């Protein structure tokens, strides 16, 4: 069989593989950054995506605060509120505030990638504005937690814990700040539920469609000294810079 015949057959096989979907292209750099927000990133607890961590923390804070609000043991109230505050504002343990900010940062990384779609470029700055109310509630929870830590009165501690629980619930579901009957109807009322919806809408608008990114790409994206992001072919794990 001639060399030319082998080449023709090889090209035919390759074309068939492409047509059948057996050969896939690597995801865009922009979509990998989106994947860090939505799916997985190698530096978080359980390597979960930043948005997933934020959602988990939001629920944990609510549960701890609700428990503290009905407890009658002051030391236990303080212990539970301290844990709720840590799950809210701690950077080292990926609290809610830190995790949602990092989710937004990675959507911004996606938007500034050379291969970002117009959709992602337009959505990133809006999402950065959308997270503001959640961050503000986190700050308030931190301040209320300090008051719980210093009080010597059980009833006061319970009342403060109830306020924290209310803010924590709003960080999950949103709030109706203007009394129009709509919870989370505008960015100033958003919680994690609305933020998840905004990112889902962004993903739905992507063309070509966004596909869930494999961990091979999610965990091996590195940033070069010139600021460019590339895949590490040696799979040594992503550069920590820009990931925390």
Spans of model-derived segments:
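Bacterial N-terminal signal peptides that target proteins for export
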Residues: 2-11
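Non-globular terminal segments
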Residues: 6, 23-24
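C-terminal motif of bacterial Sec signal peptides marking the signal peptidase cleavage site
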Residues: 18-21
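Mature extracytoplasmic or organellar-lumen-exposed domains after removal of signal/transit peptides
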Residues: 25-244
């Amino acid at each position: 069989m001639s060399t030319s015949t082998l080449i023709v057959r090889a090209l035919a096989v390759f074309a068939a593989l492409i047509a059948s979907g057996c050969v896939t292209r690597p995801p865009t750099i922009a979509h990998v950054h989106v994947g860090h927000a939505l799916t997985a990133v190698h530096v978080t607890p359980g390597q979960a995506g930043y948005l997933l961590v934020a959602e988990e923390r939001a629920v944990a804070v609510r549960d701890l605060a609700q428990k503290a609000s009905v407890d009658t043991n002051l030391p236990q109230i303080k212990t539970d509120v301290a844990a709720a505050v840590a799950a809210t504002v701690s950077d080292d343990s990926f609290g809610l505030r830190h995790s949602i900010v990092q989710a937004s940062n990675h959507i911004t990384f996606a938007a500034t990638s050379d291969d970002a779609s117009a959709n992602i470029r337009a959505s990133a700055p809006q999402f950065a504005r959308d997270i503001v109310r959640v961050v503000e509630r986190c700050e308030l929870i931190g301040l209320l937690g300090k008051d719980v830590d210093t009080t010597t009165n059980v009833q006061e501690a319970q009342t403060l814990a109830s306020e924290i629980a209310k803010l924590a619930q709003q960080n999950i579901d949103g709030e109706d700040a203007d009394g129009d009957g709509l919870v989370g109807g505008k960015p100033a009322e958003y919680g994690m539920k609305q933020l998840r919806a905004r990112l889902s809408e962004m993903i739905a608008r992507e063309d070509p469609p966004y596909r869930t990114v494999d961990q091979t790409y999610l965990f091996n994206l590195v940033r070069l000294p010139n600021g460019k992001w590339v895949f590490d072919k040696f799979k040594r794990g992503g550069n920590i810079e820009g990931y925390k």
